[in-house]
Amino acid sequence: MNVTLVEINIKPERVDEFLEVFRANHEGALREPGNLRFDVLQDPEVKTRFFIYEAYKDDEAVLAHKKTPHYLACVEKLEEMMSQPRQKRSFIGLLPQV
């Protein structure tokens, strides 16, 4: 299982727009055959900081996700909303086994 944790910091005035744009990516990702989980989390202390927890069955599923229309549209719109570049960390998911 391929897991990615992405930190996204959004300009305060763009939070509502971010949620609208990212909802389309979230809903699209959940329909992908290789997707196991796609959570959007908000930091309770810093309301402009979000974490995306993505789990895909393998590297091929991750690559397929990055070619989808919903992902490409989201990334394009996201750039101008962010207060700093995204930070990503990748993990190997061990449990639960899929």
From Swiss-Prot:
Entry keyword set: Cytoplasm, Isomerase
Domain ABM: 2-91
Enzyme class: isomerase
Superkingdom of origin: Bacteria
Residues annotated as signal peptide: none
EC number, as in UniProt: 5.3.1.32
Coiled coil: none
Keyword Ribosomal protein: no
UniProt xrefs under Gene3D superfamilies: 3.30.70.100
One Pfam family of this chain: ABM
SS bond list: none
Cellular-component GO terms for this entry: cytosol
Localization terms from the record: Cytoplasm
MF terms (GO), sorted A to Z: (4S)-4-hydroxy-5-phosphonooxypentane-2,3-dione isomerase activity; oxidoreductase activity
Catalytic activity, as annotated: (2S)-2-hydroxy-3,4-dioxopentyl phosphate = 3-hydroxy-2,4-dioxopentyl phosphate
Homology family: Belongs to the LsrG family.
Subunit details: Homodimer.
Role description: Involved in the degradation of phospho-AI-2, thereby terminating induction of the lsr operon and closing the AI-2 signaling cycle. Catalyzes the conversion of (4S)-4-hydroxy-5-phosphonooxypentane-2,3-dione (P-DPD) to 3-hydroxy-5-phosphonooxypentane-2,4-dione (P-HPD).
Protein name: (4S)-4-hydroxy-5-phosphonooxypentane-2,3-dione isomerase
Organism: Klebsiella pneumoniae subsp. pneumoniae (strain ATCC 700721 / MGH 78578)
Encoding gene, per UniProt annotation: lsrG
